[in-house]
């Protein structure tokens, strides 16, 4: 096999131990200047979780830094190996806890691919609707905390106000505000309530003008532009070399969104645009995510119209070896009772083999690789966590920048530490 060198630059990322060595062997240079090593976090509000940064400073300028992760390690991937495929869905919520349905989706999509299991059209449409509500929910948390980090406190309260509507919708549907565990292999856990669609429609009508309010407060704000424009620039070549995805990649001018390039769940049938930036700075990352919320509203409205036309269609597969039968059947069908008993005591058994699925989560490309040995429990499950990969770009972006800009840089990457450490 011939290995061809790629055209993208090799970027060196320092480790925390390398920066610690600087502190131990810190001697003044020929000009008498001496760097300082600072430990930022893990108990720091602007690291957006339990993230520690080992930072070498020369005055107020960042010489180099290294993320030190693992403080929130939960061993989710290993724990999944000890549970049946269905019982593990609840664990995926705990990774990116701001986008639990995206985690559910990529996990069940990998299993469905492994089993070659079809999903009813109505279930796919409802998945799209819920994934876009999840995207808006996640972006609202990002927008509010990002603005708060740069002292724009009002935006935080406005964003949290709208997020409450989405959490109420999730609670109406699943009984939980954050850890929803609603997706299942072959479809969804149960059908939507009668007032679900009208409630979502009311929210979308209410929400779209609020996005204009956020932009009125920030987009042309002189202080906001001074803190974000031209700061933390990543060009397209570096973004690809670093493995960035999501808005972090698109802000650098790379038009890559899995909903368009590798569509799933019927996304190829929806009309929407993919926001793409040019400068690759904090400001463009902000503009891309804000515009994504508008596009999510557009997709959600299309999904709602389709759901209205699919009334009465199934929300989960009728393959009783994968999905349990309705409870009404159990009372008169011995076969249904047996399927129900076997599914909840043993679980289904995918064939031996492996499968990889990827979707576009609010933070970028989240992937799931499932390996089956033919038993009811997976032999191995690995998640490609976009937060983990996007975070490795921080040393490259922050090098030479002011310490005051580091807080804005972290927020612009939008990491979730539950997903980083998992």
From Swiss-Prot:
It is a peripheral membrane protein. NCBIfam families: NuoD, PRK06075.1. This is NADH-quinone oxidoreductase subunit D 1. One of its GO terms (molecular function) is NAD binding. It is found in: Cell membrane. NDH-1 is composed of 14 different subunits. Subunits NuoB, C, D, E, F, and G constitute the peripheral sector of the complex. Its EC number is 7.1.1.-. Belongs to the complex I 49 kDa subunit family. It comes from the Bacteria. The lineage of its organism: Bacteria, Bacillati, Chloroflexota, Chloroflexia, Herpetosiphonales.
């Amino acid at each position: 096999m011939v290995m061809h060198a790629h055209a993208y630059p090799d970027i060196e990322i320092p480790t925390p131990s390398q920066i610690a060595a600087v502190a131990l062997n810190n001697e003044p240079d020929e000009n008498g200047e001496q760097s300082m090593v600072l430990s930022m976090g893990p108990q720091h509000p602007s690291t957006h979780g339990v993230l520690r940064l080992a930072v070498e400073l020369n005055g107020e300028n960042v010489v180099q830094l290294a993320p030190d992760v693992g403080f929130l390690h939960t061993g989710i991937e290993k724990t999944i190996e000890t549970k049946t495929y269905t019982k593990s869905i609840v664990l995926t919520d705990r990774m990116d806890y701001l986008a639990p349905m995206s985690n559910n989706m990529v996990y069940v999509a990998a299993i469905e691919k492994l089993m070659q299991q079809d999903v009813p059209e109505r279930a796919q449409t409802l998945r799209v609707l819920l994934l876009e509500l999840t995207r808006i929910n996640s972006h609202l948390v990002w927008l509010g905390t990002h603005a708060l980090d740069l002292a724009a406190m009002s935006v935080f309260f406005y964003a949290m106000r709208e997020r409450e509507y989405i959490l109420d919708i999730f609670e109406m549907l699943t009984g939980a505000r954050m850890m929803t565990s609603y997706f299942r292999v072959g479809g969804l856990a149960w059908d939507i309530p009668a007032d679900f669609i009208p409630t979502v429609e009311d929210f979308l009508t209410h929400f779209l003008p609020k996005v204009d309010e956020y932009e009125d407060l920030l987009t042309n704000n002189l202080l906001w532009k001074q803190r974000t424009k031209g700061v933390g620039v990543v060009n397209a070549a570096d973004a690809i070399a670093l493995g960035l995805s999501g808005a972090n990649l698109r802000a650098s001018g790379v038009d890559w969104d899995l909903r368009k390039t590798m569509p799933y769940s019927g996304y190829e049938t929806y009309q929407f645009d993919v926001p793409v930036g040019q400068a690759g700075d904090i400001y463009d990352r902000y503009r891309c995510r804000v515009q994504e919320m508008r596009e999510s509203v557009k997709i959600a409205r299309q999904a709602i119209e389709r759901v209205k036309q699919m009334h009465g269609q199934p929300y989960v597969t009728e393959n009783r070896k994968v999905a349990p039968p309705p409870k009404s059947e159990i009372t008169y069908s011995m076969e249904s009772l047996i399927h129900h008993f076997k599914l909840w005591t043993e679980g289904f058994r995918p064939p031996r083999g492996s499968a990889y699925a990827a979707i576009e989560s609010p933070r970028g490309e989240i992937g799931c690789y499932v390996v089956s040995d033919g038993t009811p429990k997976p032999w191995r499950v690995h998640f490609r966590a976009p937060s983990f990969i996007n975070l490795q770009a921080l040393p490259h972006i922050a090098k030479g920048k002011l310490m005051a800009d580091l807080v804005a840089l972290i927020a612009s990457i939008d990491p979730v530490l539950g997903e980083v450490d998992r």
